[in-house]
């Protein structure tokens, strides 16, 4: 065999191996699980809770055949995956697709592009993501290498919430009554509540490590409604990635992680191997609302330890910040910096300013269970988003179907007031119900300022997630954003801001983010506290096609779930 032919053979083999499409099958069905002394049926993927881990290399394309064998509708979202030109597989129900109905299938095409580390997948239909979720491990494509030392082992950690009741009943009740949803009964680590909860001595996550080894923790906060503090006793964590992108390493004794966020952390097993160490997670909650203030516990022990590997109260417990310690929560958030500097767009094409608020809607005879007999709601720029119920927005946009949505989402708050004042006029609390989107030209550099308000209860934190893009968090602040300032960039970090897809707006504060609208399609933005999403704290961005063929939405798949008008 000639050298030239052999080299051509090797090149062809390399290209073939790098173009193989990976196929997965996700079968969604109800499976009984017992926790906290009671048994209930939960939605699962492949009968697993949490769901299976997907492993890809940067730039891969995978196909996931979702088979709905459950009794309710389902969709899947690939959180943190930008899906270039492919909104058809993004997943939010009635935003980019109609649901996969019981007995039906849909083949998702998931296109990875700029994602480097850990992202995740979850259901995106009602509150089905409570148990339908899992991690996605992204690896560098050779010859690329990691910008931090390679760990000896990888550890998936999914933080979540557990209700003893059927989650469908929880949702149906608070939607029907207009009140707040019942808080969860437990927090979980990889689905395990931990031994502090009833009937959970054997339902505790246990991590065994070897002295001198390094472990890469790939973590997501999959909780429905709670930002969380997390720590491991006597062990520091080196945070190396956030939301699928590398960051400047942060050495931390605790981390704060909001629903939807992912973190990669290096854990060095460098403590006394004869001791037992506990990991713990509990809520960060700055607002005046009911919440689950319990603590979930996991166990870390060393392989050489002679101690029994069972739950006990004799080990070392971590120190976590107090539940309402805002300085601790945002002290961690603001340490996150992009590993590579100088990439944030300096000049912007468009500035959009929106408020995010909790609201009230009046009920006849004050018959609802919100404050003063009202119905709780939520809004962006005083519009409480109404999700379509028959045709999804992407289909309506692509096929020019009228009457599904409007295009009048305001670029500026419709009313200017002291957004963070202690006492607000009652008339400000009532939102407008509508399905309004914001249309953006391809290639525009968008600055989006999100301002929290103190309406109804004094304000809350809001982890805001944008589909289809990662964005630079160029500013974070407390109080009112100066909306009259012509050029606020002098107060921004335009050097190494974090590059994320989910960022928390502080209670009675604001964030400023920037992104380039170079991904045509229909893209959802919403609060990742699911009660707020259910109440309407959402908006849709439609990014128009560019001029070139590679700047236009891909054609729809043949097996897209049908809509029923």
UniProtKB/Swiss-Prot annotation:
Q: State if Oxidoreductase is listed as a keyword.
A: yes
Q: Name one Pfam family in it.
A: Cu-oxidase_2
Q: Cofactor binding mode, per the note? A: Binds 4 Cu cations per monomer.
Q: What is known about what this protein does?
A: Lignin degradation and detoxification of lignin-derived products. Involved in lignin synthesis in seed coats, in seed coat permeability, in seed germination, and in root elongation. Required for the seed coat (testa) brown pigmentation by mediating the polymerization of proanthocyanidin (tannin) from its monomer precursor epicatechin. Slightly promotes seed dormancy.
The entry lists its GO molecular-function terms as: copper ion binding; hydroquinone:oxygen oxidoreductase activity
Primary location group: secreted
Q: State the family named in the UniProt similarity comment for this chain.
A: Belongs to the multicopper oxidase family.
Positions bearing carbohydrate: 73, 182, 234, 293, 324, 372, 382, 418, 482
What cellular component terms from Gene Ontology apply here?
A: apoplast
Tissue specificity note = Mostly expressed in siliques, particularly in developing seeds. Also detected at low levels in stems, seedlings, and flowers.
Q: Which residues form a coiled coil?
A: none
Q: Where in the cell is it found?
A: Secreted, Extracellular space, Apoplast
The entry marks the following residues as binding Cu cation 2, namely: 79, 122, 528
Binding residues for Cu cation 4? 462, 527, 532, 537
The protein's name is Laccase-15
Annotated Cu cation 3 binding sites: 124, 467, 526
């Amino acid at each position: 065999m000639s050298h030239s032919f052999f080299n051509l053979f090797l090149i062809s083999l390399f290209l073939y191996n790098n173009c193989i499409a990976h196929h997965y099958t996700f079968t969604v069905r109800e499976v009984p699980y017992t926790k906290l002394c009671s048994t209930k049926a939960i939605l699962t993927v492949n009968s697993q809770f949490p769901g299976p881990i997907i492993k890809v290399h940067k730039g891969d394309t995978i196909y996931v055949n979702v088979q709905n064998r459950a009794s309710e509708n389902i969709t899947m979202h690939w959180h943190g995956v930008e899906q270039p030109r492919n909104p058809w597989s993004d997943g939010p129900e009635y935003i980019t697709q109609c649901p996969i109905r019981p007995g039906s299938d849909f083949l998702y095409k998931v296109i990875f592009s700029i994602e480097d580390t850990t992202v995740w997948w979850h259901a995106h239909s009602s509150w089905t993501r409570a148990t339908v979720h899992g991690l996605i491990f992204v690896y560098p494509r050779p010859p690329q290498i990691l910008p931090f030392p390679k760990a000896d082992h990888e550890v998936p950690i999914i933080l979540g919430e557990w209700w003893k009741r059927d989650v469908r009943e929880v949702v149906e009740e608070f939607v029907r009554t207009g009140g707040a949803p019942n808080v969860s009964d437990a927090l979980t680590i990889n689905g395990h509540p931990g031994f502090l909860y009833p009937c959970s001595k054997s339902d505790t996550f246990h991590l065994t490590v070897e002295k001198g080894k390094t472990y890469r923790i790939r973590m997501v906060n999959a909780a429905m409604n709670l930002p969380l503090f997390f720590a491991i006793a006597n062990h520091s964590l080196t945070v190396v990635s956030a939301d699928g992108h590398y960051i400047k390493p942060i050495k931390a004794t605790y981390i704060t992680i909001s629903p939807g966020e992912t973190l990669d952390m290096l854990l060095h097993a460098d403590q006394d191997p004869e001791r037992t160490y506990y990991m713990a997670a509990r809520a960060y909650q700055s607002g005046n609302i009911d919440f689950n203030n319990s603590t979930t516990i996991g166990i870390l022990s060393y392989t050489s330890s002679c101690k029994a590997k069972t739950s006990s109260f004799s080990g070392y417990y971590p120190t976590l910040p107090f539940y309402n310690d805002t300085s601790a929560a945002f002290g961690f958030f603001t340490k996150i910096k992009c590993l590579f500097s100088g990439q944030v767009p300096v000049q912007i094409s468009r500035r959009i300013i929106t408020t995010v608020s909790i609201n009230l809607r009046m009920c006849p005879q004050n018959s609802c269970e919100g404050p003063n007999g009202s119905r709780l709601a939520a809004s962006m720029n005083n519009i409480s988003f109404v999700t379509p119920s028959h045709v999804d927005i992407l289909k309506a946009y692509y096929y020019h179907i009228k009457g599904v949505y409007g295009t009048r989402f305001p670029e500026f708050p419709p009313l200017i007031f002291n957004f963070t004042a202690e006492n607000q006029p009652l008339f400000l609390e009532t939102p407008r119900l509508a399905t309004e989107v914001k249309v953006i030209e391809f290639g525009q550099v968008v600055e989006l300022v999100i301002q929290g308000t103190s309406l109804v209860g004094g304000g809350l934190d809001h982890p805001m997630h944008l589909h289809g893009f990662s964005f630079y968090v160029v500013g974070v602040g407390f109080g009112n954003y100066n909306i009259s300032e012509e050029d606020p960039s002098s107060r921004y970090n335009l050097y190494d801001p974090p590059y994320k897809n989910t960022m928390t707006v502080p209670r009675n504060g604001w964030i400023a983010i920037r992104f380039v609208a170079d991904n045509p399609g229909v893209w959802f933005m919403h609060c990742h506290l699911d009660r707020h999403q259910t109440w309407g704290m959402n908006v849709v961005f439609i990014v128009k096609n560019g001029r070139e063929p590679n700047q236009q939405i891909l054609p729809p798949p043949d097996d897209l779930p049908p809509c029923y008008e």
